[in-house]
Amino acid sequence: MSKMMMNGSGTNGTAAVANNHKEMHQRCLNPYRSKVTVVLGAQWGDEGKGKVVDMLATEADVVCRCQGGNNAGHTVVVNGKDFDFHLLPSGIINDKCTSIIGNGVVIHLPGLFDELAKNEAKGLTNWESRLVISNRAHLVFDLHQQVDGLQEAEKGGKSLGTTKKGIGPCYSSKATRNGIRVSDLLGDFKVFSEKFESLVNMYKRLFPNFEVDVASELVRYRDYAERLRPLVRDTVSLVHASLKEGKSVLVEGANAAMLDIDFGTYPYVTSSNCSIGGVLTGLGLPPQTIGEVVGVVKAYTTRVGDGPFPTELHDEIGSLLQKRGGEIGVTTKRVRRCGWLDLALLRYTGMVNGYTSICLTKLDILDTLKEIKVAVSYTLRGEKIDYFPGSITDLAQVEVNYITMPGWLKSTENVRDFNELPPEAQDYIRMIENDLGVPVKWIGVGKGRESIINVKE
């Protein structure tokens, strides 16, 4: 470095003009013309995030997925047709916005292309011009899915109930730095082949019965590389450029807060951060870009797979919620466990995610109940606690403290104005708002995209 530059002089030999640090600091605090709106599941998933995203995506310029893989499942109903999404952002339906699969997502290419083909058959068009995939995203291979099944089988009766989509093994490969990224596939194919064979050999050492036809897999992935190439970009700079241009950017969280690997009911969780932190790391965003955080809350609680569930119902009401709510997993096809709304849980996920508003879904499923219970706190070993247990052993032992509210015994399916809801339904919603200190801005009362109440202030 020259003496002139070391002394802070200008490039023409004159003294450099002092920067206005105050103005510079303000620009750092708010460097963009727009902020990101984030939609996150507030419970154990299946809250109806896809419907909310589809609604908000009609006004968005960019819709992003930031984490997870095809273990997630969203269903969006458009003109009576069910569009099922696992890897694709739900915003792909909007032909005016760009859909981004970010660096934090793990991508199973056979699943991605199959998903595109199935949705094309239902009417999805021109997606090639709207879908952008991060060059930094990691790839889920069939071998990861094979390993997922082998690991679950080894656990026997103590299995975690994973989707066996290979998500955990892929994130493990990422963490141990032998994972393979999109950029590897699109680079020197010889180098990609060597990395793939190395991954196969590692798993062969771990699992004696593990078998992969390496040659046929490499032939398949050479074809995938060319199909994928036109879709791949550096999504970090793309998202930042969109914000600098003042575009509306929407982020669709997959899974949900209680499945977050750090804040969920570990180990009965997924392998990514599906809370607000995953949005930042999964897209390369700094905290000051976050604007609205919409927590999607089902009017009752459901869970797929194993793990503690304090408000779970094992009676006819649980069966009624399952039947009326059509509670079968989009990805796993497993019946969802059902229980009462849990405010203690929602306060906890609200602390982690910082919800600025709530979308309450499936209110109509409660229409036939005479009484509705709501969990308001937990008691552990005889003492009322003001925190959410980090230990699943403790969570499995809590006693749930409920309040009971009257049901409304009227259909809400055709209601489109909050004031036209039965008074008891209005009370139920206001009770949730008052407890969480967060406004309910939307209420889902049916399956279709039009079956939603926009709550006006």
UniProtKB/Swiss-Prot annotation:
What is the annotated role of this protein in its UniProt record? Plays an important role in the de novo pathway and in the salvage pathway of purine nucleotide biosynthesis. Catalyzes the first committed step in the biosynthesis of AMP from IMP.
Residues bound to substrate: 330-336
Q: Where in the cell is it found?
A: Cytoplasm
Full protein name: Adenylosuccinate synthetase
* This protein's record includes keyword Magnesium: yes
Domain of life of the organism encoding this protein: Eukaryota
Which organism is this protein's natural source?
A: Aedes aegypti (Yellowfever mosquito)
- In this protein, the active site sits at 46 (proton acceptor), 74 (proton donor)
Q: Alphabetically list the UniProt keywords.
A: Cytoplasm, GTP-binding, Ligase, Magnesium, Metal-binding, Nucleotide-binding, Purine biosynthesis
What is the annotated signal peptide range for this record? none
Q: Which residues bind GTP?
A: 45-51, 73-75, 336, 362-364, 444-446
Which Gene Ontology cellular component terms are annotated? cytoplasm
**Catalytic activity line of the entry:** IMP + L-aspartate + GTP = N(6)-(1,2-dicarboxyethyl)-AMP + GDP + phosphate + 2 H(+)
Query: Which Gene Ontology BP terms does the record give?
Result: 'de novo' AMP biosynthetic process; IMP metabolic process
Subunit-structure text: Homodimer.
Name the residues that bind IMP.
46-49, 71-74, 163, 177, 255, 270, 334
